[in-house]
UniProtKB/Swiss-Prot annotation:
Keywords: RNA-binding, Transcription, Transcription antitermination, Transcription regulation
NCBIfam families, alphabetized: nusB
Annotated TM spans: none
Matching SUPFAM superfamilies: NusB-like
Species: Vibrio cholerae serotype O1 (strain ATCC 39315 / El Tor Inaba N16961)
GO molecular function: RNA binding
Gene3D superfamilies: NusB-like
Function: Involved in transcription antitermination. Required for transcription of ribosomal RNA (rRNA) genes. Binds specifically to the boxA antiterminator sequence of the ribosomal RNA (rrn) operons.
Keyword Transcription regulation attributed: yes
GO biological process: DNA-templated transcription termination; transcription antitermination
Gene Ontology, cellular component aspect: cytosol
PANTHER family: ANTITERMINATION NUSB DOMAIN-CONTAINING PROTEIN, N UTILIZATION SUBSTANCE PROTEIN B-RELATED
Top-level lineage group: Bacteria
Protein name listed in UniProt: Transcription antitermination protein NusB
Length: 156
C-alpha cells in the first residue's frame, strides 16, 4: 500500500465517506444502498463540491478506501461511540450530526487503519470539519481527537 497511495485519492474517499456516513445517520438506510448512490452519482457530485473546496474535487478517488470507511463506520458505530464517549464533553446524542460523522470516521481510521498516521487522521478530520461542519466545529473535533489519540494508538 505505502508509496502507491495518493493523498488526494484518500482525501476524496474521506470526503465522500463522510457524506455517506452523514446520510446513513440521517436516513438509517441500508449501507449498500447508500454506497451504490455514491458510486453511481457521477463522481460523487464532483461539480457541486468544486466551488467549496478544489482540493477535494480532484477526479481520482480511492474507491476501496471509501468502501472500507463507510462500511467500517456503519458496522462498528456503537464501538466507535464507546471509544469516543470519554473524550466528548457532552452526551453523544447532543452532538451535531456532521460532528458525529466526522468523529466516527476519524475514530475508525485511528483504531482500524493503523497504516494511516494518527496526525494525518486528525488533520484530515479538521480540514473536513472546516468545509462541511459548523463554523467552529474544527476546534471541537481537534480537541476530541487530540485527547483520544494517545488512548487508541499505542505510540500516539
Amino acid at each position: 500500500m505505502g508509496a502507491s497511495v495518493k493523498p488526494a485519492a484518500r482525501r476524496n474517499a474521506r470526503q465522500f465517506a463522510l457524506q455517506a456516513i452523514y446520510s446513513w445517520q440521517i436516513t438509517k438506510e441500508n449501507v449498500a444502498t447508500i454506497e451504490e448512490q455514491f458510486l453511481t452519482s457521477g463522481k460523487y457530485d464532483e461539480e457541486e463540491h468544486r466551488a467549496a473546496e478544489p482540493a477535494l474535487a480532484a477526479p481520482e478517488t480511492d474507491v476501496s478506501y471509501f468502501r472500507d470507511l463507510l462500511a467500517g463506520v456503519v458496522l462498528n458505530h456503537n464501538e466507535l461511540d464507546s471509544k469516543l464517549r470519554p473524550f466528548v464533553s457532552r452526551p453523544m446524542q447532543d452532538l451535531d450530526m456532521m460532528e458525529l460523522a466526522l468523529l466516527r470516521l476519524a475514530m475508525y481510521e485511528m483504531t482500524r487503519r493503523e497504516d494511516v498516521p494518527y496526525k494525518v487522521v486528525i488533520n484530515e478530520a479538521i480540514e473536513l470539519a472546516k468545509v462541511f461542519a459548523a463554523e467552529d466545529s474544527h476546534k471541537f473535533v481537534n480537541g476530541v481527537l487530540d485527547k483520544a489519540a494517545p488512548h487508541v494508538r499505542k505510540k500516539a
